[in-house]
Amino acid sequence: MQIGLCLPHFGRHLETGRLLEVARRADTLGFDSIWVTDHVIVPKDVYIAYREEMLDPLAVLPWLAGVTERILLGTSVIILPYRSPLPVAKLLASVDVLSGGRLIFGAGVGWMEGEFAALGVPFKERGSLTDEALELIQKVWTTREPEIDTKRHRLHGLSASPMPLQHPRPPIWIGGASEGAYRRVARYGDGWHSTAATPEAFRQGADAVRRFWAEAGRPGAPVLSLRIPFWLDEIHRPGSDMGYLRGRPAIHGTTRQVIDALRGFAALGVTHVALDVSLTTYPAILEELDVLAREVRPALGG
């Protein structure tokens, strides 16, 4: 199992020096990936962490490319209906080039209805907007002079650049826990990026993804990944921030309990996990990274 972490580029951890230390330490310690989170403008009634200041992930991502050397750079996830897909494709392709081919593109439809209203994006059209964006992004990433007609875009006689460094393109992992999301994995993606699932919920989602993948005639198997809140009880027990969870699953406990929980997900097919460390303090994050690198990753074959 490959282990990554979600960079806490929001809330109380929003300090450049801290983000730099976390990113470079993860890179140096051998973590497999580091992930950014997407929200633009957040209603007051949603999770406490998202009401605090948050840097734009599409600004953080190229910064990460410049301050790290080997760690993979992922988006967990870019909410595609919020932005025009062609500038997003160009920016992400540029990040892939500048990082030496380290991009993982996680994409989703979004869920925060008030955020859609603020941005003037029809909430009920988010599925079709996402599908069209994925079709366009794949096309401009793999074809120098793409020819494509969609509901909202016409590309003829145009040149797309830069091409991503990865061939044929960076991996695309689709987020979400609905039938539409599972079908989207089979149609447009290379893998499923699940969020804060119980083992049983993950198993059900993974079974659906595999079924639609086979029905679509896709070769091989989809990548199965998981983003989930994490902390080590012996280092820090979150207090007031537990409101962020709102009953969502998390991986926590002793080091041995965390290893066992991750092994349980590995048995369900998870090959990549992105641990959300934002619930703990900054000193605790640094200490947890050391424990993960020293004890957890080796136990999981990392």
Please provide the spans of the model-predicted regions.
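Active-site-adjacent structural elements that line small-molecule/cofactor binding pockets in enzymes
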Residues: 1-302
